[in-house]
């Protein structure tokens, strides 16, 4: 008789955006319980071993973590399968490196290097705003945080700017038409654009129409949209392509141009 959760994860069942090779063994690291869903996170072992190449083996990753060299959102993490997720700040003080976990235009996690003031905050999407015991208002964020006494103007689907040292809300962005967003789910994951229109369907999910900087329009669900700035200016720096997805033909032309130039 099965008792509790599975403790293993087969490599073929691992999320595609982890980019694990098929011949690297039968198993993949199973993410621990944490602030992000198991299929929407990147375990620390994959960050250190597969992405940053600071370790060659599983044991080397454990040795690095046990020396307390890795911090996620300003807290030391020693769990090798700790689930880091979208917008998390991964810091390695020994090498003076800081990264923010974002999506590239192909929907895969990328470690985007950040510096200065950007390492001191993260953006959090508000899941719900409720009242607790004795009428105390609080909000829940997408990464499992509960923050009491928020600004009364903050509603569900808005984005808050959270100071990682004090864990206090510094500022917030309303989920409005005209603000810049990043898509965090579905086939358009990783694309960045400005909200053009909101379609409300009674008894069904809301559809959001987004236009990117290249003028391409696409639609996605409300739950897949994460506001990252006011107007067209994002509050966080973006990866190389700035969230603009190229079509297959545009990518082929770009490759040909690069080959001809070489």
From Swiss-Prot:
SMART domains: KOW, S4. GO terms for cellular component: cytosolic small ribosomal subunit; nucleus; ribosomal subunit. Signal peptide: none annotated. GO terms for molecular function: mRNA binding; RNA binding; rRNA binding; structural constituent of ribosome; translation initiation factor binding. GO terms for biological process: translation. The keyword Lipid metabolism does not apply. Pfam families: 40S_S4_C, KOW, Ribosomal_S4e, RS4NT, S4. It is found in: Cytoplasm. Keywords: Cytoplasm, Ribonucleoprotein, Ribosomal protein, RNA-binding, rRNA-binding. Residues 42-104 form the S4 RNA-binding domain. InterPro entries: KOW, Rib_uL2_dom2, Ribosomal_eS4, Ribosomal_eS4_C, Ribosomal_eS4_central_region, Ribosomal_eS4_central_sf, Ribosomal_eS4_KOW, Ribosomal_eS4_N. PANTHER family: 30S/40S RIBOSOMAL PROTEIN S4 (PTHR11581), SMALL RIBOSOMAL SUBUNIT PROTEIN ES4 (PTHR11581:SF0). This is Small ribosomal subunit protein eS4. It comes from Gossypium hirsutum (Upland cotton). The gene is RPS4.
């Amino acid at each position: 008789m099965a008792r509790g959760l599975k403790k293993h994860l087969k490599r073929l069942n691992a999320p595609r955006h982890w980019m694990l090779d098929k011949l690297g063994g039968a198993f993949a690291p199973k993410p621990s319980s944490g602030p992000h869903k198991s299929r929407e996170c990147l375990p620390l072992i994959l960050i250190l071993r597969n992405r940053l190449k600071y370790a060659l083996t599983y044991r080397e990753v454990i040795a690095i973590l046990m020396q307390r060299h890795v911090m996620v959102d300003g807290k030391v993490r020693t769990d090798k399968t700790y689930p880091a997720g979208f917008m998390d700040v991964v810091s390695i003080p020994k090498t003076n490196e800081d990264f923010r976990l974002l999506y590239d235009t192909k929907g895969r996690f990328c470690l985007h290097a950040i510096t200065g003031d950007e390492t001191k905050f993260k953006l959090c999407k508000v899941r719900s705003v409720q009242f607790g015991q004795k009428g105390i208002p609080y909000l829940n964020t997408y990464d499992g945080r509960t923050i009491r006494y928020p600004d009364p103007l903050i509603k569900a689907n808005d984005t808050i700017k959270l100071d990682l040292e004090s864990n206090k809300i510094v500022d917030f962005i309303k989920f409005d038409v005209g603000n810049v967003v990043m898509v965090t789910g579905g086939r358009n994951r990783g694309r960045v654009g400005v909200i053009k229109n909101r379609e409300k369907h009674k008894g069904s999910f809301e559809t959001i129409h987004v236009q990117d900087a290249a003028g391409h329009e696409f639609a996605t669900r409300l739950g897949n949209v994460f506001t990252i700035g006011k107007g067209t200016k994002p509050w966080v720096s973006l990866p190389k392509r700035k969230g603009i997805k190229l079509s297959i033909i545009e990518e082929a032309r770009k490759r040909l141009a690069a080959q001809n130039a070489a």
